Amino acid sequence: MCIRDRPILPKMDRVGYWAIEAWGGATFDTCMRFLDENPWERLRSIKAQTPNTPLAMLSRGQNLVGYKHYSRDICNHFIKAAKRNGVHVFRVFDALNDIRNVVDNAEAIKECGGHFEGAISYTMSPVHTLDSFLDYGQKLKDLGADSICIKDMAGMLTPYRTERLVKAFNAEIGLPLHIHCHYVGGMAPANILKAAEAGAAIADTAHAPLAFGNSHPAVEMIVAALQESRYD
């Protein structure tokens, strides 16, 4: 999306979303590379149109929004600049779930009064067990995480694995749990339904024109699926 899509933002601001993820990750690079836009102006412009809804960004931990590790002072200044320009929720992940690459971000977020959402990169291997995810979740909590995100960036989660994860995190970690499932494998809508039933607090969706494929389930689909339930 580009800045010219701003007319939809006031309507989105009235929906009541927990947050709108509008910045960080690859969007910082791609808005310059393909749209010739200033990412900081883009952020300020979006925030001006969404005064009632917190904006969220994705940080790659020590990589921030780039493709290499940055120093502690750069992490500190970048996070605080993002907060000043409109970001409130900072979802921070490390692809290897290495807590050392999250520490500098976490400290800066807490210092500037942002919401630190610690993200757990979900994948499947002999070492990626439920206990390993819970252990990392506890490390994020110890760093001061305000919420935890299960980040299924490759669409590998299944509905019943999702249910087990959510129940275990609610029992052992006790922070609001956020489910982030890409639609790649087609199971994301079912994962969100099982997550809701198991007690997840938040789920990521996208508006229908930008949903499905490598994106997320459509918000319209999830709203319809939850109608006439206690999650409506």
Where are these regions (language model features)?
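Catalytic cores and adjacent flexible loops of soluble metabolic enzymes
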Residues: 4-91, 95-232
